[in-house]
Amino acid sequence: MKVIKTLSIINFFIFVTFNIKNESKYSNTFINNAYNMSIRRSMEESNPPTGASGRAGAGASGRAGAGASGRAGAGAGAVASAGSGDGAVASAGNGANPGADAKRSTSTPATTTTTTTTNDAEASTSTSSENPNHNNAKTNPKGKEVQEPNKANTETQNNSNVQQDSQTKSNVPPTQDADTKSPTAQPEQAENSAPTAEQTESPELQSAPENKGTGQHGHMHGSRNNHPQNTSDSQKECTDGNKENCGAATSLLNNSSNIASINKFVVLISATLVLSFAIFI
């Protein structure tokens, strides 16, 4: 009888210690799973605000830089074109080819004596537009052969004054037209340069939204991959399942194992109590 009593008591203490170890194990796994879930949620909640701030900063800086650089470039281009237009107007006769103008002035001063009193630029433009001798000046830059038709013109001027008047009328209006047409055509070129500068701004501004989409994708994957990977079965199930249900299956398994251990504990306690009463009675 004493042997049965001692065996029952030893069995009772062994079962109690075994159940305590199991309970501590399951409780530790449950606590670890809950802790890992809380860490994941905190990481996922903390990462999107930082990503949004980074995106906003990048977009603002990109847009500001693109707008400033594009507009500054457009303004500089417009100023440069305007300056070039003014230079072209000022040096219509002498700026392009000073040597050619000097040769033209020696070879073809003008068709009549009246046009010599006008400016050199007007004389050069008038002869370049309609004077047949000017074509000879282009083909012969030295101006040797051009002087001969000029002598013929001076002889015809001395013979008849009517021809001189007709030549002055035929030569003077083209100078005015050339002078008036050249400044008007150049502002049109300056105006045409402005839309091209505006068109160069548009692709830079349109490229900003694309850099946003790639930034969002990178931030999301970076936040997911930077988490510490755990090798337990319960955490693998969390990665495979939804975020909301993460840990639900593991908690149910832990609860079922705890229930089974409790049932075993109750059965063994009842058995030991029955044996103890039987022994003592």
UniProtKB/Swiss-Prot annotation:
Region (3 X 8 AA tandem repeats of G-A-S-G-R-A-G-A): 51-74
Region Polymorphic region: start-end pairs: 44-207
Free-text comment about domains: The N-terminal region appears to be involved in lipid binding.
Gly residues biased stretches: 54-76
Sequence repeats: 51-58, 59-66, 67-74
GO CC terms of this entry: plasma membrane; side of membrane
Originating gene: MSP2
Record protein name field: Merozoite surface protein 2
Signal peptide: 1-20
Function according to Swiss-Prot or TrEMBL: May play a role in the merozoite attachment to the erythrocyte.
Domain of life, per lineage: Eukaryota
Membrane topology type: Lipid-anchor; GPI-anchor
Lipidation (GPI-anchor amidated asparagine): 255
GO biological process, alphabetically ordered: cell adhesion
